[in-house]
Amino acid sequence: MFAIDPLKHSKLYEEYGLYLRPHQINQEIKPTTIKKKELAPTIRSIRYASLLHSMLAKHAARHNGTLINPRMYADMITLGNTKVTVTKGTPKAQIDTLKMNGLTVVSKSRRNNKKKPVSDTTATTDENTNDIVTYKALTEMSTLVESFHLPSGLTLIVFDDEKYQSLIPDYINQLITYTQPHIIPTWQGIADFSDPYLRSYFRRPFELTASNLASPQKHNLSPLTRSIFNNTGREDAIIKKLYGYGEYIFIKYEGCLITWTGVYGAVAMMVNLPKRDLGLDAGDNFLKEYKQLLFYGVITDATPSGISAKSTVIKISPHKMMNPSGGALAVLSKFLEAVVSANVINATLVVYAEKGAGKTSFLSTYAERLSVASGQAVGHLSSDAYGRWLAKNKDVKEPSFEYDYVLSRDTDDTESYYEQRASELLTLHGISELAQYELLSVRKKVKMMNEMNEILIAQLENADTHSERNFYYMVSTGKNTPRTLIVEGHFNAQDATIARTDTTVLLRTINDTTQAMRDRQRSGVVQLFLRDTYYRLLPSLHTTVYPFEMLESIKRWKWVH
């Protein structure tokens, strides 16, 4: 019994590449033989489980969504029978009916509680009225279970996937505590097709590639038991017409799985775009569609990935679309709630990310899309905004904090104060080239980073007008600063100074930031040194989000203008 009814939610299972075998839906179709070793321990028609889902939903609806004594229901379904207790005085005809349905009936005194319903169960040993189940519910459930002839019960099947588990009905969640569910592993939303339950209930995918493209007869395939995963790079319609796959179901995956060359070996990346919209083919360079990859991609390998500006596509395969995590959507929804609320003076989102992650490029676009969706101006300050402003104003007695002026300083051709100080520190230690820096011992690097850290901290909260705390306060409260503001950060101590907000996230992107710094044309050794310094100080306790999750949160929000 799947935790989510496949008959009523077939579209959900199709997202996992799962299509029910025909005989599970229509009993008039003779089931195709499956090897005994491939069978699951207990196989029953999917219709039985669908009837149980309907019965459980009906019983829960009688009590505002709550199952009375979920343990009894769990035992009845997964064990095939249960022991129930009825109060003395229960009509003999009712007791006989329960016994006929395979229940062991034990009589118990009412203890002078005349209003108590007819029966309860031995799942509890006291007279807790919260656990008492009516005779009507017991009869309905036991009659249904008995009709299936299930002496061993049904196994509850759950996918190890966040989206799947978030959609499990409440009445099933109430049962799970009292069962030992069979967990089907998933990888990035793709179910483990070797699982015996999946093989018994669903068509098993067969992967067609350019190297094995041939007729189904050559592969000994049947449309009753197999679906087709088209990884040939050719359109489904062409494969069906030319190779005789007209009767087969082709799995529809709208995302991509791209394999790249990398400094340390092949790199796998999932992208929430179909290949036709992405515009990449084997041999294409990483930078060709960089923004699309940055906005919709996630690296699946351990960091550092080794992807760089020189990386090229090895192959592109169809893949299931990624779903935003519940944690990411929750924290982003909190920010969007502030954006639309008339009771919030300023809505500020603080975003930390590694230096070189591409956060400024992405967040500029995010701010534009949020502005269009919300119908209001959205401001954006890069993580270098303060350092660049300070470089121009450190000797100015009364500097301007006007938002537009700060933006005019916040450009790539303006050297940051921290870049200046990092360059001075590297020169002091005799470092002028990337190779020299990378050959330093760990102890030497850490010593230099600690010195740079002191420079960063010195500017945070000093009493000077030019301190970082004063800068962010003056800019964020300025009369020309947009009410909704996105502010980038570099390191953990900025939590205390960067902006007044209760919404802070840690952005993960596709970039290998070390490689990104090496690829930069301007002051590569300075950029890499700053990246390493900031990385050690990156706040890791904030909720991690990916660019595609931030964009998806805007799409899912119910905007009212």
UniProtKB/Swiss-Prot annotation:
<keyword id="KW-1035">Host cytoplasm</keyword>
<comment type="function">
    <text>Minor inner capsid component. Displays NTPase and RNA 5'-triphosphatase (RTPase) activities. May function as a cofactor of polymerase VP2. Associates with microtubules and plays a role in the formation, structural organization and morphology of viral inclusions, where the assembly of cores and the replication of viral RNA occur.</text>
</comment>
<keyword id="KW-1153">Inner capsid protein</keyword>
<dbReference type="GO" id="GO:0030430">
    <property type="term" value="C:host cell cytoplasm"/>
</dbReference>
<dbReference type="GO" id="GO:0044163">
    <property type="term" value="C:host cytoskeleton"/>
</dbReference>
<dbReference type="GO" id="GO:0039625">
    <property type="term" value="C:viral inner capsid"/>
</dbReference>
<keyword id="KW-0167">Capsid protein</keyword>
<protein>
    <recommendedName>
        <fullName>Microtubule-associated protein VP6</fullName>
    </recommendedName>
</protein>
<keyword id="KW-0946">Virion</keyword>
<keyword id="KW-1037">Host cytoskeleton</keyword>
<comment type="subunit">
    <text>Interacts with VP2.</text>
</comment>
